[in-house]
């Protein structure tokens, strides 16, 4: 009997877990993967920018660094860049109780070039116009700076340039498991033989997201689910 489900949604949001655990199968806790994260936005920011993309940017966390884009939501952040960095963000939340995503809002400029550009006289320009003209920062990117930085930093050229290149964005939690594209956790490989059959339940095979592994992207997820499903099916 082959068994393959969406780990978070299959059989009523992971209800298969206690069914197998009761039979002695070792299962790692299911965790959201390729998921969004909660951020404590101000009401003004959330109402104005929810649904807007932030691009191009570079995100970094725990030594990992990647360029891409993401979307602002009413409750936080989601999108390709966030999904790619979801594992280290989740791990930081689990081990440290907090996590910070650092953003480079001007990936096309070095810190030195950005500092020089922002040091040019503003004249009668507002801060918003100065950021737009000298740094290419406007819209939601400018909104993020105002949301996350104290006024003193916004008005100090060197500090502002450094913040644009390394803006700290605290995240408070993963989105719920049933919103995640995929999951980490699942049936431990030690519970399976080389044919993906449960050692304690002969004739029962596991595949797909039921297995304890984590896909870096949706594409890898589908490929591995198809591959493990086929491998298990060959022994049924």
Map each language-model feature to its residues.
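Short hydrophobic core segments
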Residues: 1-9, 20-21, 70-75, 204-206, ...
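Glycine-rich loop(s) and the adjacent beta-strand/alpha-helix scaffold that form part
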Residues: 1-43
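Residue-level recognition of phosphate/Mg2+-coordinating polar/acidic sites
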Residues: 3, 58-204, 216-218
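Glycine-rich phosphate/pyrophosphate-binding beta-alpha loops
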Residues: 6-7, 36, 78, 182, ...
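Conserved mid-sequence domains
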Residues: 10-11, 198, 208, 214-215, ...
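An active-site-proximal "capping" alpha-helix that borders the catalytic cofactor pocket
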Residues: 16-24, 223-236
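Acidic, Ser/Thr/Pro-rich intrinsically disordered regulatory segments
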Residues: 38-69
């Amino acid at each position: 009997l082959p068994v393959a489900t969406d780990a978070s949604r299959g059989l009523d949001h992971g209800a298969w877990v206690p069914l197998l655990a009761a039979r002695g199968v070792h299962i790692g806790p299911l965790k959201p993967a390729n998921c969004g994260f909660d951020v404590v936005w101000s009401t003004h920011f959330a109402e104005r920018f929810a649904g807007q993309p932030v691009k191009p940017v570079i995100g970094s966390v725990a030594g990992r660094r990647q360029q891409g884009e993401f979307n602002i939501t009413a409750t936080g952040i989601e999108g390709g860049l966030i999904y790619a960095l979801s594992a280290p963000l989740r791990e930081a939340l689990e081990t440290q109780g907090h996590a910070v995503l650092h953003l480079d809002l001007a990936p096309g400029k070095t810190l030195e070039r950005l500092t020089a550009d922002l040091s040019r006289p503003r004249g009668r320009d507002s801060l918003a116009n100065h950021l737009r003209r000298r740094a290419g920062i406007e819209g939601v990117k400018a909104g993020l700076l105002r949301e996350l930085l104290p006024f003193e930093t916004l008005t100090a050229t060197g500090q502002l340039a450094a913040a644009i290149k390394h803006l700290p964005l605290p995240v408070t939690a993963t989105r719920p498991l049933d919103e995640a594209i995929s999951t980490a956790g699942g049936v431990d490989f030690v519970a399976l033989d080389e044919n993906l059959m449960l050692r304690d339940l002969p004739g029962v095979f596991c595949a797909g997201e039921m297995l304890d592994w984590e896909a870096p992207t949706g594409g890898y997820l589908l490929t591995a689910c198809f591959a493990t499903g086929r491998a298990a099916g060959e022994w049924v």
